[in-house]
Amino acid sequence: MKALIAALLLITLQYSCAVSPTDCSAVEPEAEKALDLINKRRRDGYLFQLLRIADAHLDRVENTTVYYLVLDVQESDCSVLSRKYWNDCEPPDSRRPSEIVIGQCKVIATRHSHESQDLRVIDFNCTTSSVSSALANTKDSPVLIDFFEDTERYRKQANKALEKYKEENDDFASFRVDRIERVARVRGGEGTGYFVDFSVRNCPRHHFPRHPNVFGFCRADLFYDVEALDLESPKNLVINCEVFDPQEHENINGVPPHLGHPFHWGGHERSSTTKPPFKPHGSRDHHHPHKPHEHGPPPPPDERDHSHGPPLPQGPPPLLPMSCSSCQHATFGTNGAQRHSHNNNSSDLHPHKHHSHEQHPHGHHPHAHHPHEHDTHRQHPHGHHPHGHHPHGHHPHGHHPHGHHPHCHDFQDYGPCDPPPHNQGHCCHGHGPPPGHLRRRGPGKGPRPFHCRQIGSVYRLPPLRKGEVLPLPEANFPSFPLPHHKHPLKPDNQPFPQSVSESCPGKFKSGFPQVSMFFTHTFPK
């Protein structure tokens, strides 16, 4: 009996210590693939590019390897709607100001075999922040650049720009502005320029619940006199738009998802090349290589919508709203389809509440002073040293701070065309931002319901100043079942590691080495 007890204790000890640090350079292929899957999962914002693997641990459970990764990232200028591979994003147009936004993501991924193509992302949690103001050096510069946090204030400018584009491109007649992603202002010389990036979506005049989803992305440049106060009438307006074909991002296996299981465009092994933007005969060439929802039963294969508007490719089948209590814990992987566990226990479900990425009104002044648009009541991460947070950003009891919810990413969400029904349940629950960082919702960026537990969250924090470090994302991930795992003495997944691997962090890949100062670990050991 004593021998049996000793054996059981040894087995338990073995599994309790199974999560082990690993070399950051050794897991680089998995980290790159995981970041690609995360980008393809996201609905809003810009593609993350990998700067560095900050930490890496792994756990081997029978034939499955679980990766616990901490990735330092930087936003590119490519919209996530492009579905590009993050390393294929071209450098930004030097004529337009490009905001420098850094971030850190904690990621849990699994691989059942030794093939990297089998990698699945189980969950992720990211924090991002702009460092443009902190890096600005305009002591002798005649040009001042501001990056605004409250982008919703410039929706009128986006609408005006899109209207001009519609006048010259009939195929864009039914498109509307969706989200205002970035707004920059350049002052100096002979005038003032506003540079507005925004996503658009197709909104036909008549409601067709089976209408395919089509999204696009536009960049508008509006120029005014130096002291112009009226932003309604720019002296010059230039806009470039491109549309992304959802058919290119369907299940690459060609197998339609089961009805009732949320299907998402993300999870492809590789991003397909986007088709050229709509360019009707006689229209001007409005594009250059940018870096950058409706619900119902699936339509029959031969069904098409003949409403007014651009000819739309057939996209992923929209879905009927479904009860969260019937959802399964879903993951997404490189086979192009969303994966589901076979555990239907409602306790494994994590209802989320869907919120957009929005911030207080805030502009980044080159001298780190607040322009008139600033909201002085917003909380800042100033003075928060990484060691002042819980290890790896872990919140004590897994609750989020009051008043803040994550942005859950789902292509099957509602946009400006389709306000959610009043009886539509909200099913969003996330991991929470770093403690002490609350953010108020802005106008026009309300909750977007979706069908089921969402994978992954991205939190936009206030801009960093010189000497500050990016707060770490939380790591209170919910439990998930490992595939093909039947061992009764080992939990499904381990808590996210609190220690740092001795073989980490890796080296920075960025062309901006100065951003390294904003991360916890600046130099490799």
Curated annotation (Swiss-Prot):
Residues 284-293, 351-371, 379-407 have a biased composition (Basic residues). Residues 348-382 are annotated as: Necessary for endothelial cell focal adhesions and anti-angiogenic activities. Gene3D superfamilies: 3.10.450.10. Pfam families: Cystatin. The record marks R439, R440 as: Cleavage. Changing G103E: In THPH11; HRG Tokushima 1; results in increased intracellular degradation and reduced protein secretion. Residues 41-84 are annotated as: Interaction with ATP5F1A. Residues 252-407 are annotated as: Disordered. Residues 19-136, 137-254 form the Cystatin domain. Its cofactor is Zn(2+). Keywords: Angiogenesis, Blood coagulation, Chemotaxis, Cleavage on pair of basic residues, Copper, Disease variant, Disulfide bond, Fibrinolysis, Glycoprotein, Hemostasis, Heparin-binding, Metal-binding, Repeat, Secreted, Signal, Thrombophilia, Zinc. Residues 310-320 have a biased composition (Pro residues). It is found in: Secreted. This is Histidine-rich glycoprotein. It comes from Homo sapiens (Human).
